[in-house]
């Protein structure tokens, strides 16, 4: 079944009202995109910001007369007679298959591969993690996750215990276990992340070595030889003392989820406990590493 879509240039003040109106006019879905590709890296807690220049795309069934919809839109005072819009035909596709075709095995470092379950493993002798893309948590495609995976691939995990602080999908925890860690503790504030980590550990056969906790449930004396935290700059600053006390003397630390321009400032929060290395960068993002004093 073919579709037709209406694209409208609007702003962050009127996007919600416009979305409601288009749904009333029979739109099947609404998508909001940044008209100028302006990134939002770290919104305020509870905030879901929109862009000043927002492109709204409304999808309709092909037999809907969009000329009628456009006439209704012209009556809205915040749009007026001369608002910018575009009508496009949408090819009918197997969207699930097309989505799956976009994901391929990815190699990190020398040993580590992340592979979707529907793809053939490129190197059976490598360290392979089976992980399917999800909506909320990391799958290795984001630069910060890639930076952490590359760092983990470089380590010797013999007789080492690890903390994955902000475990999300569990991708870093599972990677550490597949690379040889004896035990990993994953901590996250989101119970859905705990469930996702557990499921991914089970899929990769390492669930018996992974302990998962919400912050309030974690052991009070928890420490590890290696700690990786891929969260955001704000929490990394605020939680520096807590993170530091979880790393044993001589232990290794990796922090990511921060932008290049944030790296130096965040590193300063850790220098009293760690000998910090020079940051590593990928695209606009950075990773900090250090050794516990």
UniProtKB/Swiss-Prot annotation:
Q: Which domain of life is it from?
A: Bacteria
* Keywords for this protein: Cytoplasm, Methyltransferase, S-adenosyl-L-methionine, Transferase
Under SUPFAM superfamilies, the record lists: S-adenosyl-L-methionine-dependent methyltransferases (SSF53335)
Keyword Secreted: yes or no? no
Q: Which reaction does it catalyse?
A: L-lysyl-[protein] + 3 S-adenosyl-L-methionine = N(6),N(6),N(6)-trimethyl-L-lysyl-[protein] + 3 S-adenosyl-L-homocysteine + 3 H(+)
Task: List the coiled-coil residues.
Answer: none
Q: Give the location in the cell.
A: Cytoplasm
UniProt GO molecular function: protein-lysine N-methyltransferase activity
Q: Which GO terms describe its cellular component?
A: cytosol
Does the record carry RNA-binding as a key word?
no
Q: Which family does it belong to?
A: Belongs to the methyltransferase superfamily. PrmA family.
Q: Which PANTHER family match?
A: ELECTRON TRANSFER FLAVOPROTEIN BETA SUBUNIT LYSINE METHYLTRANSFERASE
The entry's protein name is Ribosomal protein L11 methyltransferase
Where does this protein come from, organism-wise? Shewanella sediminis (strain HAW-EB3)
Question: Its encoding gene is what?
Answer: prmA
């Amino acid at each position: 079944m073919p579709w037709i879509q209406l694209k409208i240039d609007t702003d962050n003040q009127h996007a919600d009202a416009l979305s409601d109106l288009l749904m009333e006019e029979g739109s099947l879905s609404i998508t909001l995109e940044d008209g100028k590709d302006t990134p939002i890296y770290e919104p305020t807690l509870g905030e879901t910001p929109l862009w000043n220049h927002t492109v709204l795309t409304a999808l309709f069934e092909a037999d809907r007369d969009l000329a009628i919809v456009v006439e209704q839109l012209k009556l809205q005072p915040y749009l007026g007679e001369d608002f910018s819009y575009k009508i496009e035909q949408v090819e009918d596709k197997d969207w699930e298959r097309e989505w799956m075709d976009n994901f391929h095995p990815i190699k990190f470092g020398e040993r580590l591969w992340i592979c979707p379950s529907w793809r053939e493993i490129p190197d059976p002798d490598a360290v392979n993690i089976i992980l399917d893309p999800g909506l909320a948590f990391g799958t290795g495609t984001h630069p910060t996750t890639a930076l952490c995976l590359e760092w983990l691939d470089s380590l010797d995990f013999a007789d080492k215990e690890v903390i994955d602080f902000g475990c999300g999908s569990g991708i870093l925890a599972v990677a550490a276990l597949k690379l040889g860690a004896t035990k990993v503790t994953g901590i996250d504030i989101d119970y859905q992340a705990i469930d996702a980590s557990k499921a991914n550990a089970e899929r990769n056969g390492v669930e018996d070595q992974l302990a998962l906790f919400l912050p309030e449930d974690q052991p009070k004396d928890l420490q590890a030889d290696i700690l990786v935290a891929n969260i955001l700059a704000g929490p990394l600053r605020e939680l520096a003392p807590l993170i530091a006390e979880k790393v044993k003397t001589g232990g290794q630390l990796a922090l990511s989820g921060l932008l290049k321009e944030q790296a130096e400032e965040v590193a300063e929060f850790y220098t009293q406990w760690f000998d910090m290395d020079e940051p590593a960068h990928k695209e606009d993002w950075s990773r900090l590493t250090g050794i516990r004093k």
